[in-house]
């Protein structure tokens, strides 16, 4: 397949899955009786209730399924979807990151729209750095905590992080802004604005809420979300390269991928266009060792090369690439951090609860600690 076809296929896939995620997110916020009302309008026998909630995207994350298996010794519903993603990664590399992940698509968009880095600054920003090892330490810490019985993967899993940020912070914040706007339009002396405010509020309220919504920690979640997005202006796809534990897991699996980048150094003119367009800082330039664990399968390098010095082909790996560059102390630090999570989480006094001796229990009832 030609390079431009691969790039367009990736763009179409990214757009589809991002819109699907947003659609299912909005559907999960709609009152269920609204579907009943719409069903009655169209047909008494037609059910417009959606049966594919947004949890489908959570099931696509093998990180969620594996952590649940490790921490609770149970296989969650939809585990096979995550297993399929792992198998696909072994075959084709991190195509989930490049083609499917809605959070990755948002980072890609933020990095792409009016990029603040150009020329030599972009080349420098797209060089592999030691900071890309951090995501492996995060992965180790999360799995170590899961082994100890504390599953904290939901905090940093990209699908969970995106859903939490949008549902608890972004959408409620937009709702507050819209209600202020609608109130201003409704109080206007211009009749057209009055009618428009009523119609817009009827359409928007089911999605953004009929009243102001407040969630504990929403400000922190929203600010953290914006900071992570802003970091893309400094280093493209900062989250994907540096922090994403799912990316680390898929990166480990992609080391044996049979879809590999082939380089023809004789054709290379050192224009560095491949480096400028690389989303994963995977060293695509001929003469450098390709970091397939960091490659996000965006195929930008393949498309950008004017000399056809790069191509993706199916071939058996000559051997396992060296394991990620992680020192023993750093790995040990990740393990210690993960093992410490369950104990640090109980420093608020939950570990030493004492039943109130003044409580009176009915005859035959069990102590509170047994509940």
What does each model-found stretch correspond to?
Residues 1-288, 293-294, 300-371:
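Non-ligating segments of multi-cofactor redox enzymes
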């Amino acid at each position: 397949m030609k390079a431009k076809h691969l790039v367009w296929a990736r763009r179409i896939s990214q757009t589809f899955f991002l819109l699907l995620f947003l659609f299912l997110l909005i559907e999960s916020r709609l009152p269920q009786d609204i579907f009943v009302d719409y069903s009655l309008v169209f047909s008494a026998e037609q059910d417009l209730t959606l049966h594919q909630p947004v949890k489908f995207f959570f099931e696509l994350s093998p990180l969620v399924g594996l952590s649940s298996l490790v921490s609770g010794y149970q296989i969650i519903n939809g585990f096979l979807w995550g297993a399929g993603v792992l198998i696909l990664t072994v075959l084709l590399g991190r195509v989930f990151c490049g083609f499917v992940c809605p959070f990755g698509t948002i980072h890609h968009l933020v990095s792409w729209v009016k990029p603040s880095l150009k020329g030599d600054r972009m080349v420098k920003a797209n060089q592999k750095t030691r900071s890309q090892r951090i995501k492996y330490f995060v992965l180790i810490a999360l799995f170590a905590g899961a082994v100890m019985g504390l599953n904290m993967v939901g905090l940093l899993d990209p699908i969970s992080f995106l859903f939490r940020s949008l549902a608890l912070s972004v959408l409620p914040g937009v709702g507050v802004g819209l209600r202020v706007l609608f109130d201003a339009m409704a109080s206007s002396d211009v009749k057209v604005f009055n009618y428009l405010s009523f119609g817009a509020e009827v359409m928007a309220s089911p999605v953004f809420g009929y009243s102001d919504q407040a969630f504990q920690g929403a400000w922190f979640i929203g600010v953290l979300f914006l900071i992570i997005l802003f970091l893309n202006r400094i280093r493209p796809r900062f989250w994907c390269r540096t922090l994403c534990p799912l990316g680390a897991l898929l990166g480990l699996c992609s080391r044996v991928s049979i879809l590999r980048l082939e380089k023809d150094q004789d054709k290379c003119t050192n224009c560095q266009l491949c480096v400028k367009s690389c989303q994963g800082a995977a060293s695509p330039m001929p003469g450098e060792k390709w970091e397939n664990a960091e490659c996000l399968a965006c195929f930008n390098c393949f498309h950008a090369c004017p000399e056809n010095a790069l191509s993706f082909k199916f071939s058996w790996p000559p051997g396992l690439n060296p394991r990620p560059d992680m020192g023993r102390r750093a790995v040990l630090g990740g393990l210690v951090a993960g093992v410490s999570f369950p104990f640090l989480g109980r420093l608020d006094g939950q570990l030493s609860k004492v039943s109130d001796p003044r409580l009176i229990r009915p005859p035959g009832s069990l102590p509170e600690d047994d509940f």
